[in-house]
Amino acid sequence: MKKSIFQIIGLLLLLPLFSGCNDSDDVAAIFTGKTRKLNYITVDGGHEMFGFWENEAEKKKSMDELKKNGTYNVIFEGTTEDDLIKGNIRGSVITSYPLAGTWSANGKDNKFKANITEGKDGGDKLAKNFLEGLKNATSYEGDSKNLYLLYKPTGSQQTFRMVFYVVNQ
């Protein structure tokens, strides 16, 4: 009797080995079904907003805009096929400036690409870098709660990271 119990427990412990693992991300869970808001843009490895501004007045204007509901938002819509997902991106940059385009991501190698067809920065430095980050993003990291888009600004060797969080699902 005791031997049978140990054999059953042993078989149950082996089940995870037979179920296999998938080494790609669930791109649909990461990107779709939620609105994401920019938290900050930083150099890769950093944890605070990069200093894009020439003076405190510009920075304050950008940060006040970032704090508003409905600004710096992105919504990814798409369909998956194997490890690939592609679709439309929409959202807002700053008040009165909508965002639209297409995007794709690969769950196997974490590649990301966006083609932004609508979006203006209104002269705001953070908005300019937000749009540039979306347009130049080459890869992503994250999960269903946090999203990081990595990009290099035009003419720069430094990698930047756009940090997003979920505002609603």
Model-derived regions, located:
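Bacterial N-terminal signal peptides that target proteins for export
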Residues: 1-9
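C-terminal motif of bacterial Sec signal peptides marking the signal peptidase cleavage site
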Residues: 16-20
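Lipid interaction determinants
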Residues: 21-169
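Intrinsic disorder/low-complexity polar-acidic segments
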Residues: 12-14
